[in-house]
């Protein structure tokens, strides 16, 4: 499973650790990703999504159906990658 948000498409970024003497070493900034279950009213089932904190805010603002449709049209996820729980 890749570390990409299924709603916003956010993924890890690469940057630098900077020490006190200003030496720079490469590091990755990971996304605040977690697995969350939602009740999908349109299909009358529970689904599981890998989303970041910003993705949860998008779902709270727009609604689950609108956020999923927008993510599918932008190519962040497809309907086959969404896990249907029951």
Curated annotation (Swiss-Prot):
Which GO BP terms, alphabetically? translation
One cellular component term (GO) for this entry is: ribonucleoprotein complex
**MF term (GO), any:** structural constituent of ribosome
Any matching Pfam family:
Ribosomal_L28
Per UniProt, the keywords (alphabetical) are:
Ribonucleoprotein, Ribosomal protein
Coiled coil: which residue ranges?
none
Q: Which InterPro entries match?
A: Ribosomal_bL28, Ribosomal_bL28/bL31-like_sf, Ribosomal_bL28_bact-type, Ribosomal_bL28_sf
Q: Which SUPFAM superfamilies match?
A: L28p-like (SSF143800)
Q: Which family does it belong to?
A: Belongs to the bacterial ribosomal protein bL28 family.
PANTHER family in the cross-refs: 39S RIBOSOMAL PROTEIN L28, MITOCHONDRIAL, LARGE RIBOSOMAL SUBUNIT PROTEIN BL28M
HAMAP family per the UniProt record, alphabetical: Ribosomal_bL28
Protein name in the entry: Large ribosomal subunit protein bL28
Classification from the root reads: Bacteria, Pseudomonadati, Bacteroidota, Bacteroidia, Bacteroidales
